[in-house]
Amino acid sequence: MTEVTKINPSTAITELEPYEMAQTNKEVPTTSLLSKDYYGHSIEEPDENNPTRWRYERPLDTVRAWQYLIDCDENFKTKPHREQNQYRPTADSFRPLSFASMESKLTQRLSRHLSKTSSRHSRL
């Protein structure tokens, strides 16, 4: 038995286009959508190139978040959220690695020099 539905064929002609629906539906401001990350947390410092991402978000975190959104991985929900495992840069983290290795070399040289001078003074 077939069901008879009452569909008006002229609705396709008279219904609003998506851009018209967006203009008439002003309930949700777009700024509130942009200030949330993948988990629904608010973004205090958005990235300049991508405002839907936190400023210091690592690329791997972005990939994992997208993977979660695509696969709906249940194990992902049990992992800590962004605030708990996110990289927080400090002044030392922006120092080039060559300076860090140079500093350790200078410290080693200085300690060797001080030990040599102290041994010389003890012989006198």
Swiss-Prot record:
BP GO annotations: regulation of cell wall (1->3)-beta-D-glucan biosynthetic process
CC annotations in GO: cell division site; cytosol; nucleus
Top-level taxon in the UniProt lineage: Eukaryota
Summary of subunit composition and partner proteins: Interacts with dil1.
Protein's name according to its UniProt entry: Uncharacterized protein C19C7.04c
Organism of derivation: Schizosaccharomyces pombe (strain 972 / ATCC 24843)
